[in-house]
Swiss-Prot record:
Protein name in UniProt: Probable GTP-binding protein EngB
Organism of provenance: Streptococcus agalactiae serotype III (strain NEM316)
Role summary: Necessary for normal cell division and for the maintenance of normal septation.
Keyword Oxidoreductase attached: no
Residues that coordinate or bind GTP: 35-42, 62-66, 80-83, 147-150, 179-181
Residues the record lists as binding Mg(2+): 42, 64
Domain EngB-type G: from-to ranges: 27-198
Cofactor(s) of this protein: Mg(2+)
Lineage: Bacteria, Bacillati, Bacillota, Bacilli, Lactobacillales
Length: 198
């Protein structure tokens, strides 16, 4: 349980950054959270930290346009990466986000693992596959978290998991976690897996 190692409720947003000159300058380990717009990233953060509105959930996808750094008990940081795959964002804007995300993922020494969130209800998008391949190429540790599990009958979970893994060309050495912010499925497993990567 995470509570043995850190007070997960002692969390706050630290800063938002557009480039590396704005990143926190210390050696705290960081966990990046990446995923499509409206995949449930904010809900995932809020559920893990036992807070309702620390990470703002948005009905307007693509609202997170900066890297948002969250301080957790002065021992760990979550880094909320801008949601990708939002159609109404211009190509220029998407390219800018892509460059910002890439710079962080490839150059940040503090980064320990990326939690890549996918929607459990659907096959991974081209963007989901691309970011997974990117992380594998650069040998960045990755945890796949399949969100919104409460929307699928438990009897169909294996089928959905197999389909997602096949489309991603999933590496068996990586972790795959089924998660729901509604009934907290996967909460302890998420924390245990994240902490094992630090």
């Amino acid at each position: 349980m995470a509570e043995e190692f850190l007070n997960t409720h002692n969390a706050s947003i630290l800063l938002s950054a557009a480039n590396k000159s704005h990143y926190p300058q210390d050696d705290l380990p960081e966990v990046a959270l990446a995923g499509r717009s409206n995949v449930g990233k904010s809900s995932f953060i809020n559920t893990l930290l036992g807070r309702k509105n620390l990470a703002r959930t948005s009905s307007k996808p693509g609202k997170t346009q900066l890297l948002n750094f969250y301080n957790i008990d002065d021992k760990l940081r979550f880094v909320d990466v801008p949601g990708y795959g939002y159609a109404k964002v211009s190509k220029t804007e998407r390219a800018k986000w892509g460059k910002m995300i890439e710079e962080y993922l490839v150059t940040r020494d503090n980064l320990r693992v990326v939690v890549s969130l996918v929607d459990f209800r659907h096959d991974p998008s081209a963007d989901d596959i691309q970011i997974y391949e990117f992380l594998k190429y650069y040998e960045i540790p990755v945890i796949i978290v399949a969100t919104k599990a409460d929307k699928i009958p438990r009897g169909k979970w294996n089928k959905h998991e197999s389909s997602i893994k096949k489309k991603l060309n999933f590496d068996k050495k990586d972790h795959f976690i089924v998660f729901s912010s509604v009934d907290r499925t996967g909460l302890d497993e998420s924390w245990d897996t994240i902490l094992s990567e630090l």
